[in-house]
A protein has these predicted regions:
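Domain-level signature for respiratory redox metalloenzymes
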Residues: 234-241, 273, 277, 281, ...
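N-terminal export/assembly segments and adjacent metallocofactor-ligating motifs
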Residues: 1-328, 334, 601-607, 611-835, ...
Length: 987
């Protein structure tokens, strides 16, 4: 059996070496000292006293008699026709922030958007979401949002701003002075039309698109190879073999929500299927995608180009063609080439490189493998990335030369995330006319002379074409909370046109989209149907012929074949899965979401290989100085390539709300070229120690057989491979299993489908009002997440296998937590749910101590203003402010200080589903009720249902030979089970 470990400390020193106490062991002075660490001393309160007294039953009973103030709800006097109190309304819409896109449903309660769900009708995202999509609803209630137009620090009325802007635009137009409209990639047909009209009226305005995480190399390579600029449509669900060079396509590359669904579709083993795709990842840093690979080859960034050139040589050699350069043979690459060749037309090679030469060679490899038209489509393109890096470089040159006299920015922050951000900042200060059109403050808007604040996307109308002929609409779920106006409406207003952008969209659709269909006799019917569904995906036949236009590949191969003689450390920058390029740095849900691989939150850090750390005598938490420019804490990451280090971008924001300000370090400026890495990096140990908020060692289950796995070949021979002990444990008891006459709710997690992305965790937080506790409390193991995604390493610490496992309350039918609660606050329902009576809980924490799965969470403070006692409040992210409390789900009780909470299997959704079925006089249908984690999951890894329904999908999965329960040997009889992880080690 494999040995599984969560950290290098655990691997080397054993289970008990890893701290897991929410409070430290020791004498009274040591215990009290934790309250003073990093905080001002404060008076003890009643809960502190109970903590130190072991929460005796007698004292707790006395304290529980305290009363809270009464708060009254105010009903509607005249109910709006479309609103029924207590019933949610859903609006089909779209999430679009920079390069992130998702077709969504907005859930509103009494006019408040409170939750984002995926749109199952979308042919792009297919109902899946990401952690950023789920967390975006909280940004609507961000207290740092701009609330009105401004000139400098002076508040303006919109009429005053419009007059000022028109005057400046006309002045610059008459003088024929250049103005730049700087935006992120725009893939809204109507917005593009508005911008084109704006430029037609002001011909001195030049439109430039800028992406901080750009796909410029892909776009240029496709134009060079096929004569069509753009990003190809990748189909991982058609690929039997995938080779990825540093492309984190499950984490941050292009469109992860779509990629995850496609990728896991080829990894599911159900309905008798025994075939899986084979995935090889060649990379420097252990990424989310690399963590899911069947085989991973750690290499330095400088070595990857040579390996790609070698792979191309091997492929054309197999094709019987003449090779361009004589390169050193690599055994791994030769075998990969043979495996790819045996999967011609059903393979896919991708690269995350920003080097155009690399992308040209990758295109050539895929063309030789006959993948175009199958796993790759040039005629169907991804439109969320359009920017050309050279355009932004030209803008900076024009600013510095004085040629550029005006700038209008929308949705970008180059002062922070552009490589030459400091130069951009200095040049921007010299421009007379500068106008920002953003919803929140950032480093760039702070330097602009004028501000026209934009709406949040949940307050906006828009349309999108994320992929060729895949259209979607955005509609608001609430009226603007502040005195803001959409970017498009502002442009229309400055043109002297009707500023109603909705009318503009409808006119554009009637002219361009309506003729693409024949199902609806008039535009009104077509529009209403499309608005209701949120998408329009016409069938349009492609006429593009994919021909590879480059005939001489010699220069490209030679460019890649140059061996970089770099023996020093190389630095690689990567995009954070949680906060991306920094646009969502002020979102506390995302800041507190642990990185899927390192399990660290509230910081960025320097990933160092175990061998490098040993040589330099570094440990996790040591602070190093990088090239005498920035200081960063070290994290020793298993699987990190030797002589390489990596750090996430998006951190170190200086101008934003209180949540994201000064969290981590900005490293964007370190990369001063188009290369993907920085060579010859010097690290100097400072002697300082930094506390990282790391959750990977919290809530340990003491090294027992938690993850079960097997190889594909073993599984084909024996479907119970890796799960042989299940049958013995399943029938070990002499007692009869509990019976539930009506429903018995349960859940299955397919470990083959779970990639560890974290969407489920944020969805649960949004649905169930799970509080944010802040970095200091996370360090104390006080985090509150109801569902954690455990990450396990196994094998060699220098290149380990990785397993992800979502763990929530297991809803045991023989629950150890229930019989130790002195007041029966936790008990079992008649439908198999382990439920909590919050107002009965007195906070002894006996249940948490007795839970073998460590899934119960204790409220050390009042994080969401659940009671009226000021001393109980602990507000790290303004979550107690009334504006942010608008995001709370009224169907879920907010918990007060001193109360235990945990996963309820979304009992509020179960009750709603049962009531709907009762009203309609029928039984609950299988799949009708979905938990928040299940609905958010882009891979469909979670299945919820009724264990009493023998025809349900859940029961079919629990009947699988791969099905097992956590810690079956202690006979807790969980209602949550798992399907063993199967790895395809050979193609």
């Amino acid at each position: 059996m494999n040995k599984y470990w969560k950290s290098l400390t655990e691997l080397k020193n054993g289970e008990n070496s890893v701290p897991d106490q929410a409070m430290p062991k020791g004498n009274l002075e040591q215990i009290l000292d934790i309250f003073d660490k990093n905080e001002n001393a404060s008076k003890s309160n009643r809960r502190d006293f109970l903590k130190l007294c072991g929460f005796s039953l007698a004292i707790s009973t006395v304290v529980a008699s305290c009363e809270n103030s009464v708060q009254k709800a105010i009903p509607y006097l005249i109910k709006p026709e479309e609103v029924t109190p207590g019933k949610a309304n859903y609006y089909a819409s779209s999430f679009a922030k920079g390069n992130d896109y998702c077709s969504i449903l907005i859930k509103t309660r009494e006019g408040r958007p409170i939750k984002i769900e995926g749109n199952d009708l979308s042919g792009v995202t297919h109902g899946g979401t990401s952690s950023r999509v789920q967390a975006s609803v909280l940004d609507l209630y961000d207290t740092s949002r701009y609330k009105h137009p401004k000139k400098g620090n002076q508040k303006l009325a919109w009429e005053e701003l419009d007059e000022t802007v028109k005057k400046e635009l006309n002045r610059l137009k008459n003088a024929n002075e250049q103005v730049v409209l700087l935006t992120s990639s725009i893939y809204s047909p109507s917005t593009i039309s508005v911008i084109q009209k704006f430029i037609a009226q002001y011909p001195n305005v030049k439109w430039v698109q800028y992406d901080s995480q750009s796909a410029s190399a892909l776009i240029q390579a496709n134009e060079m190879c096929f004569g069509k600029a753009g990003v190809s449509d990748y189909r991982f669900d058609y690929a039997d073999m995938i080779v990825s060079f540093d492309s984190d396509f499950l984490g941050t590359w292009l469109m992860p929500v779509e990629h995850i669904r496609q990728y896991t579709k080829k990894r599911k083993l159900c309905n008798g299927n025994t075939s899986m795709s084979h995935h090889i990842q060649i990379e420097s840093r252990l990424s989310l995608t690399g963590s899911n690979a069947d085989k991973r080859i750690p290499v330095k960034p400088s070595e990857q180009n040579l390996l790609i050139a070698q792979l191309y040589n091997e492929i054309i050699k197999l094709a019987g063609k003449e090779i361009y350069s004589v390169l050193e043979n690599n055994t791994d690459i030769q075998q990969i080439a043979k495996d790819l060749w045996s999967h011609k037309g059903k393979s896919l090679v991708v690269s995350g490189s920003k080097d155009t030469n690399v992308q040209v060679i990758v295109n050539a490899i895929n063309f030789e493998l006959e993948n175009y038209g199958s796993t790759l489509r040039v005629d169907k393109q991804l439109h969320t990335f359009k920017a050309n890096d050279s355009d932004m470089d030209q803008v900076l040159k024009d600013m510095k030369s004085g040629k550029l006299k005006g700038i209008i920015s929308y949705g970008v922050n180059p002062v922070f995330d552009y490589q030459q951000g400091k130069e951009f900042s200095d040049a921007l200060k010299k421009i007379d006319f500068s106008l920002a059109m953003d919803e929140v403050p950032n480093e760039t808007t702070a330097l602009m002379s004028l501000l026209a604040p934009d709406n949040h996307f949940l307050e906006s109308w828009n349309d999108f074409e994320p992929k060729t002929n895949r259209y979607s609409l955005m509609q608001p779920g609430i009226r603007p909370l502040f005195d803001t106006r959409q970017f498009q409406s502002s442009l229309l207003s400055w043109m002297g046109e009707d500023s109603n952008y909705l009318n503009f969209i409808k006119n554009n659709w009637e002219k361009n989209m309506y003729p693409m269909q024949a199902a609806y006799p008039n535009f009104t019917t077509f529009w209403n149907h499309t608005l209701q569904q949120g998408i329009f995906e016409p069938s349009v036949k492609s006429v593009f012929d994919t021909k590879f236009s480059l005939t001489n590949m010699n220069s490209f191969v030679n460019q890649l074949a140059k061996q970089v003689d770099n023996k020093d450390i190389e630095l690689q920058l990567y995009e954070s899965i949680a906060i991306g390029d920094g646009k969502m740095a002020n979102n506390p849900w995302l800041q507190e979401m642990p990185d899927p691989v390192t399990k660290i939150c509230w910081d960025n850090y320097l990933c160092v290989s175990p061998k490098q750390a040993e040589e330099m005598m570094l440990e996790t938490g040591d602070v190093v100085e990088l090239n005498s420019q920035v200081k960063l804490p070290v994290y020793v990451l298993p699987g990190q390539a030797y002589n390489t280090v990596a750090v996430a971008t998006g951190y170190g924001r200086q101008v934003c709300g209180i949540v994201g300000k000064n969290v981590g370090v900005n490293v964007n400026f370190l990369l001063q070229s188009d290369d993907d890495f920085i060579g010859d990096v010097k690290l100097a140990k400072t002697g300082e120690i930094y506390d990282l908020a790391m959750t990977q060692t919290h809530h340990s289950m003491e090294g027992r057989a938690i993850v079960r796995e097997a190889g594909l070949e073993e599984y084909k021979k024996n479907p119970s491979a890796g799960n042989e002990s299940h049958h013995a444990y399943e029938n070990a008891s002499i007692y009869e299993k509990p019976k539930f006459p009506n429903h018995h709710w349960g859940l299955v997690v397919d470990l083959n489908s779970c990639v560890g992305c974290g969407a489920c965790s944020i969805a649960c937080q949004s649905e169930n009002n799970v509080p944010v506790v802040g970095k200091k409390e996370v360090i104390r193991a006080h985090e509150m997440s109801w569902i954690r995604i455990d990450r396990y390493f196994s094998g060699d610490e220098f290149n380990p296998d990785v397993s992800f496992q979502p763990v929530m309350c297991q809803h045991c039918d023989n629950a150890p937590c229930e019989n130790v609660c002195p007041v029966a606050a936790t008990n079992h329902s008649s439908e198999g749910l382990n439920q909590m009576a919050y107002n009965r809980c007195i906070g002894t924490r006996y249940c948490g101590n007795n839970c073998p799965y460590k899934v119960r969470r204790f409220n050390w403070f009042d994080y969401t203003k659940a009671d009226s006692i000021p001393n109980n409040l602990h507000d790290v992210a303004e979550m107690t402010i009334d504006l942010k409390r608008m995001v709370l789900n009224p169907d879920v009780t907010i918990r007060a200080k001193g109360v235990i909470e945990k996963c309820s299997l979304c009992v509020q959704r179960i009750q709603e589903g049962k009531l709907n079925a009762k009203i309609e006089g029928r039984k609950v249908k299988d799949g009708e009720i979905k938990t928040a984690c299940q609905q958010a999951c882009p891979s469909g890894a979670i299945i919820f249902g009724d264990l009493n329904d023998k025809e349900s999908k859940l029961v079919k999965e629990t009947s699988s030979k791969r099905n097992y329960h956590l810690l079956e040997e202690i006979h807790t009889l969980p209602s949550v089970s798992y399907l063993t992880k199967i790895r395809n080690k050979k193609a």
